[in-house]
Amino acid sequence: MPKIKRLPDEVIKKIAAGEVVERPYSVVKELVENSLDAKAQNINVYIEEGGLGKIVVEDDGIGIPPEELPDALLRHTTSKIASFDDLYYLESFGFRGEALYSIAAVSKISIKSRVRGENNGYELIAHAGEVINLTEVGMAYGTVVTVSDLFFNTPARKKFLKSGQTEAGLIRQFIEKMAILYPGVKFSLFIDGKKIYSSAGIQEQLGLLARFWGLEKGNLLMLEEKLGEGFFIKGGIALPPAGKPHRKLQVFAVNKRLVKSGILTKAIDDAYESLLPTGLKPLVFLEVVVPGTWVDVNVHPQKLEVKFMDEQKIYLDVRTIIRNKLVNAKSSSLKSFSPARETNTKSEDNDYWQVTYFAEEFSGNSDKLLEKEDIFSTSDNLTFSLNKDFAKELNFQVIGQFSLKYIIVEKNDKLLIIDQHAAHERILYEKYQTKLNPFYSQVLTFPVRIKASPELEAFLQENYQNFLEIGLHIEPFGPGEYLVREIPEDFPQNNIANVLEEYLYEIMEQKEQVSFREKALKLFACKNAVKFGEKLTYSEMTNLVKELFKTNYPLSCPHGRPTIYELSLTEINKKFFR
């Protein structure tokens, strides 16, 4: 049996570094936070090759005295705290003394710094944490940290990184968030020699938020509410119906520290309940300021999560304030939506089914039911083979629509409950499959601008040709933004920007091992299919069921979800002990 023994110092260093430095973004985050702790008013960030080639962070902060420079690379050396109790009164980002130690352990690092009152600065050079040189240099006041060859001594770490473009995108998004959180500090970001982002540093948070979300200032509401001694809520929110189909542009901060918080996410979702169209997430930039004794910031290696002492109070106060602000906002853009998931025909006081329409018998050929314009009509005269006996005959009777989600059908002594969205998805998918090209494009009169996360930005560039082949012409329009000039001719016309963003993210995140075109076909059918919550006429329900029974695979949607739940008369009789 192996003996217990101490790990070599080199291994300990690399393990510790891995907890703090996961990727180039981690390096930039730690260095920028150090600059802010040093009271910097100007912070410039330069990256090459997504940060793997070089990262430079320069600031005009208070600097590091030359006699302290070697100590800066030692583990658990810090100027931020002196005792454990100081953790409850933190006014800085750093406190563990691990950031520079961890970065230096997996890179080649240079730290140049000059404090006020000194004629010159000093430069410390280290490789893999070992000091190589300390020399006097000429430089402006402040600190410049240069990190080169990141992970040069841990090559396995590089294998888990995304493309350089994705890494650069994560850094850009971080800088944008910090510029909003610290509007009085001027931030600049340079990627491969090109200036990508800069803020003015003039305490103008509203404009920075509008730019970050791609919205007009009039669609935003700024917040600053005092809820108690040392307890504030600050930031900004987007007024409904503005929203995104994802949470990537939601930002939370606690005591000036960017964090992820399930409690704050839940509070925001509940505050926006019924005010946003189904499928959209709120746009929020929320900073919670609380006394240090209310929160534990030492629960995550990268300080990305915090723990509130009284989570219920935080949840209730945040939800109430945001909800009241939204409801009372005097904006013409604020109107209430009833999400489809909450729309139902069930009474609050009576637990019984209530159907929207009652049936006439359908024998497969009744012209009078088709007088209204039919959203499920099939003019292509396509012939489908059937794969189930019950679907071979078109004799059935639609009973009605339940909860604006399901169609209730009687067929051959069976009760069928049909998912209207999944059924229409199957119909459209097979219809598109038979078309020579279901993705004929149409040129938009006014191009649509969309915001792209770093991951989506890389995905769009890698699949430019694939998107052209499915009728989407998307081109770059500045950092993190794209213009959509052409869309497929059958693409939904309402709320194009949000539907398109959702469509793109879903294609990107699909893990199914099928072709790009196949993924696009399935999602295209999904986006065009009738939704839960849509009221259907008797004619529309009848034709939807008829066309479903004509498909090759009527029992499931293209993604594999069932379309039909079947109850036999025998099963129903048993429930009534007959």
From Swiss-Prot:
Gene3D superfamilies recorded: 3.30.230.10, Histidine kinase-like ATPase, C-terminal domain, MutL, C-terminal domain, dimerisation subdomain, MutL, C-terminal domain, regulatory subdomain
Cellular component aspect of the GO annotation: mismatch repair complex
Superkingdom per UniProt: Bacteria
Xref: Pfam families: DNA_mis_repair, HATPase_c_3, MutL_C
Database matches in InterPro entries: DNA_mismatch_repair_CS, DNA_mismatch_repair_MutL, DNA_mismatch_S5_2-like, HATPase_C_sf, MutL/Mlh/PMS, MutL/Mlh/Pms-like, MutL_C, MutL_C_dimsub
Any one Gene Ontology BP term: mismatch repair
Keywords, in A-Z order: DNA damage, DNA repair
A single MF term (Gene Ontology): ATP hydrolysis activity
NCBIfam families: mutl
Family per similarity comment: Belongs to the DNA mismatch repair MutL/HexB family.
Function summary: This protein is involved in the repair of mismatches in DNA. It is required for dam-dependent methyl-directed DNA mismatch repair. May act as a 'molecular matchmaker', a protein that promotes the formation of a stable complex between two or more DNA-binding proteins in an ATP-dependent manner without itself being part of a final effector complex.
Protein name (database record): DNA mismatch repair protein MutL
Organism per entry: Carboxydothermus hydrogenoformans (strain ATCC BAA-161 / DSM 6008 / Z-2901)
